[in-house]
Amino acid sequence: MMTSNSLYKSINATTMRLILSCMVLVLLSITASAQEDPPRPLQVSTFQNLSFGAIIQGTTGGKIIIDPEGSRSVTGDIIPVNMGYSYYPAIFEIRALPGALINIVNGPDVLLNGNNGGTLLLHIGNSIPNSPFINTRNPASPIQVRIGGTLTVGNSIANPAGNYIGYFSVTFA
């Protein structure tokens, strides 16, 4: 036979178990949410440098243009020649997560210094693909970005024959 005191304790214990069971069920039904991982940064590497090839400059100079597809054209009295020097656009390989929006920002015009004196002005041109673009490849398969440029050449006194070298910047974001 149960006394009222032991009945009270039994009901109290049963109620506590029921409350604890409900709390456990409530806690199990709560879904945790957190902020997603930040996107991985782009990985960019130079696959090929920009090259304008060989030319013969005239008396007034002009411009040499390399488009992103690799074609070369000239203005003024510049004569394009091959002479074993190839011309081609710069190619960068980008690895990014699929769906990443990639912007290309060209740096400022730069001066290329000649080994026999003189400087040439380099303007970075358009790209293929055009900016901005969405990466559709996985990081194991890089996308190639081709960038052309325009080189301004003066007369032979201002720009004596020789090799001209310099560095330009392009930002991928």
Regions flagged by a language model, labelled:
Residues 33-105, 109-111, 135-173:
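N-terminal small/polar-rich segments of proteins
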Residues 16-24:
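Sec-dependent signal peptide recognition
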Residues 9-13, 82, 112:
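Short N-terminal leader segment in a subset of presequences, especially plant chloroplast
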Residues 6, 44, 104-105, 121-123:
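Generic hydrophobic, helix-prone segments enriched in Leu/Val/Ile
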Residues 98, 106-132:
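Surface-exposed binding patches on compact interaction domains or structured appendages
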Residues 29-31:
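N-terminal signal peptide c-region/cleavage motif recognized by signal peptidases
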Residues 1-16:
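N-terminal secretory signal peptides that target proteins for export/translocation
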